[in-house]
From Swiss-Prot:
GO terms for molecular function: rRNA binding; structural constituent of ribosome. Signal peptide: none annotated. Keywords: Ribonucleoprotein, Ribosomal protein, RNA-binding, rRNA-binding. SUPFAM superfamilies: Ribosomal protein S8 (SSF56047). The keyword Transcription does not apply. One of the primary rRNA binding proteins, it binds directly to 16S rRNA central domain where it helps coordinate assembly of the platform of the 30S subunit. This is Small ribosomal subunit protein uS8. Part of the 30S ribosomal subunit. Contacts proteins S5 and S12. Belongs to the universal ribosomal protein uS8 family.
Length: 132
């Protein structure tokens, strides 16, 4: 059976692993997931990630989660735009997450980026998720 929301699955895996205090989490690899993980790493929400290749062409991402004095750095991560309900935002209507302490990750014509980068480049797009 195919997965209908791969990005939502990755977000849920990250959330569950952080709630359990895990150091790493593994999720199937894809381009979209890699781009979202790039943004999370740039913004300092995760330590990093590595692509693990398996025989037969399958590959996974091994994500290193980040903690600050035992508390998870990601306090809240949620999917905004889902396959059944797409959410788009222009630069003017782009909401801030917790008064700028968090980020929104957007899919724009210029690639996957945070809301801060989208405002700098004056571009809107689909709001994939919010992280705080």
């Amino acid at each position: 059976m195919t997965m209908t929301d791969p990005l939502g699955d990755m977000i849920t895996r990250i959330r569950n692993a952080q709630l359990r205090g895990k150091g790493k989490v593994v999720t199937p690899a894809s381009k979209l997931r890699g781009w979202v993980l790039d943004v999370l790493a740039e913004e300092g929400f995760i330590r990093g990630y590595a692509r693990v290749e398996y025989p037969g062409g399958k590959s996974d991402f091994e994500i290193e989660l980040k903690y600050n004095e035992g508390a998870p750095v990601i306090q809240m991560i949620e999917r905004v735009s889902t396959p059944g309900r797409r959410v788009y935002s222009s630069v003017k209507t782009m909401p801030t997450v917790h008064n700028g302490l968090g980020i929104s990750i957007l899919s724009t014509p210029k690639g996957i980026m945070s809301d801060v980068a989208a405002r700098e480049q004056n571009v809107g797009g689909e709001v994939l998720c919010r992280v705080f």
